């Protein structure tokens, strides 16, 4: 046998033995398939449909099991009861952010999504309060979304009812809402800076969704030595941060401490208030990372949901017709939809919820981590262990949602046609790490979808039975297949 191969195998075995001793000494991990040296269970997992693999392993090992993505163990939680117990009942213990080496390399542990400890708690509290205050300000977030919805309608009218790919236009609207909240102004859809920002965000989202990213995250030691699209992600992120820094400097020059205009102003004021605190988490570097996180989390996820939602409405014409009937009855054709309308529109509300449930946008959540040694069911999860929660197993639970693979707003309606809440509805996750922008995203989805369907009929040149709604292969988020449609003014 080749001496080099012998050396590699020997070192791999020693590494696994060391990890096993370390984990067995500190805790009792759940059962799982036997990992291979270095690569762990990667060959046993369908990286194009990880949720399917999780479902398979849950039938063998139960709702809590261990997989090795590379040499590091990850505890997987499957099913509503186990997910709720982990994220709600043990929310503090599992409030750490799991490892994501590519992102960690870009933001150095800063920002809102991938930070930990005191840093994360302070940034999360600040962001929640800031967004809440904007919702109650002179110009509320709802006003900004309504303005963007009107601009979106005008852009769609410019298509003149011709066949078009809606990807770009539907990406612009949520991104512009974020721009309004963060930068104080929206952009024209043809603005050069806006187009460049959109291009970088869209490209990064696609790359981060690729199976290659799963390999990079499982084997981070090899990142620096491998060519590949991960290098493009790092470059794009640097350019996004550079643009954000330019906007921050503009804000610094015009800042009025008594009249904050947007998220950046509020952050700069907080920095000034804490300038004598040597341990402050509010720095320029932290601001850039946080704003970048707000863009990534608040634009791509919402635009993908919109795009997927229109595809489902294009296929299920009977649902679209019922929504339009309810809109015509409650709002009419000429008044702008507002959030107060939602309580009088149970079918439309159910439709928006069903889109989110059905598409299951982030099927396996963003990884969590144990902040201490955690006793979870019959196991002891060592501090620092990554935890992955299967949101698919909750959103597609066949007991809560009969025929979960079928798109049916009836999943959220009672026998009298009233809207019916469900504890299983957790597309924004649950617990301490629940999405900060949930309220904003819910508002955007209701107002933008309702405004589009109020103003346009959706038409496809493909027979509805032939419209494919199967998501494209990905690892992190579910993306709809490419499609074209016509927006016919009503």
From Swiss-Prot:
Its EC number is 1.14.14.1. The keyword Ribosomal protein does not apply. Induction: P450 can be induced to high levels in liver and other tissues by various foreign compounds, including drugs, pesticides, and carcinogens. Its main location: endoplasmic reticulum. It is found in: Endoplasmic reticulum membrane; Microsome membrane. It is a peripheral membrane protein. GO terms for cellular component: endoplasmic reticulum membrane. GO terms for molecular function: heme binding; iron ion binding; oxidoreductase activity, acting on paired donors, with incorporation or reduction of molecular oxygen, reduced flavin or flavoprotein as one donor, and incorporation of one atom of oxygen. It is an enzyme of class 1 (oxidoreductase). Its cofactor is heme. It catalyses: an organic molecule + reduced [NADPH--hemoprotein reductase] + O2 = an alcohol + oxidized [NADPH--hemoprotein reductase] + H2O + H(+). Keywords: Endoplasmic reticulum, Heme, Iron, Membrane, Metal-binding, Microsome, Monooxygenase, Oxidoreductase. Heme binds at residue 435. Signal peptide: none annotated. Belongs to the cytochrome P450 family. Metabolizes arachidonic acid mainly to 19-hydroxyeicosatetraenoic acid (HETE). This is Cytochrome P450 2C55. The lineage of its organism: Eukaryota, Metazoa, Chordata, Craniata, Vertebrata. The gene is Cyp2c55.
């Amino acid at each position: 046998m080749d001496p080099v191969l012998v050396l590699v195998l020997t070192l791999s075995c020693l590494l696994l033995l060391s990890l096993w001793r370390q984990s067995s000494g500190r805790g009792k991990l759940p059962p799982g398939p036997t990992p291979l040296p270095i690569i762990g269970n990667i060959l046993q997992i369908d990286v194009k449909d990880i949720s399917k693999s999780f479902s398979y392993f849950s039938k063998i090992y139960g709702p809590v099991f261990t997989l090795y993505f590379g040499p590091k163990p990850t505890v997987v939680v499957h099913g509503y009861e186990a997910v709720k117990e982990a994220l709600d009942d043990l929310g503090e213990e599992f409030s750490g952010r799991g490892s994501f080496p590519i992102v960690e390399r870009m933001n150095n542990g800063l920002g809102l999504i991938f930070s930990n400890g005191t840093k994360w708690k302070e940034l999360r509290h600040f962001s929640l309060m800031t967004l809440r205050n904007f919702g109650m300000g002179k110009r509320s977030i709802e006003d900004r979304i309504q303005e963007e919805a009107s601009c979106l309608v005008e852009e769609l009218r410019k298509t003149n009812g011709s066949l078009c790919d809606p990807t770009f236009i539907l990406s612009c609207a949520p991104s512009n809402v974020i721009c309004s909240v963060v930068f104080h102004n929206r952009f024209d859809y043809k603005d050069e800076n806006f187009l460049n920002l959109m291009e970088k965000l869209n490209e990064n989202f696609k790359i981060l969704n690729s199976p290659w990213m799963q390999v990079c995250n499982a084997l981070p030691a090899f990142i620096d030595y491998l060519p590949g699209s991960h290098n493009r992600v790092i470059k794009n992120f640097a350019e996004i941060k550079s643009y954000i820094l330019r906007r921050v400097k503009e804000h610094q020059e015009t800042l009025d401490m008594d009249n904050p205009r947007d998220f950046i102003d509020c952050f700069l004021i907080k920095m000034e208030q804490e300038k004598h605190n040597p341990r402050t988490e509010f720095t320029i570097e932290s601001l850039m990372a946080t704003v970048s996180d707000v863009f990534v989390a608040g634009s791509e996820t919402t635009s993908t949901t919109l795009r997927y939602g229109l595809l489902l409405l294009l296929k299920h014409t009977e649902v679209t017709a019922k929504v339009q009937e309810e809109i015509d009855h409650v709002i009419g054709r000429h008044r702008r939809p507002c959030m107060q309308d939602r309580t009088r529109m149970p079918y439309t509300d159910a439709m928006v919820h069903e889109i989110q449930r059905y598409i299951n946008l982030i099927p396996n959540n963003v990884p969590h981590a144990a902040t201490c040694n955690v006793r979870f069911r019959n196991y002891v999860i060592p501090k620092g262990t990554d935890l992955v929660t299967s949101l698919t197993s909750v959103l597609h639970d066949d007991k809560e949602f009969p025929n979960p693979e079928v798109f049916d707003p009836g999943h959220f309606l009672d026998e009298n046609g009233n809207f019916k809440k469900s504890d299983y509805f957790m597309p924004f996750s649950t617990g301490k790490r629940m999405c900060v922008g949930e309220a904003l995203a819910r508002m955007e989805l209701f107002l933008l979808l309702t405004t589009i369907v109020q103003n346009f009929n959706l038409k496809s040149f493909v027979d509805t039975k032939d419209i494919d709604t199967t998501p494209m292969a990905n690892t992190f988020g579910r993306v709809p297949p490419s499609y074209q449609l016509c927006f016919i003014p009503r």
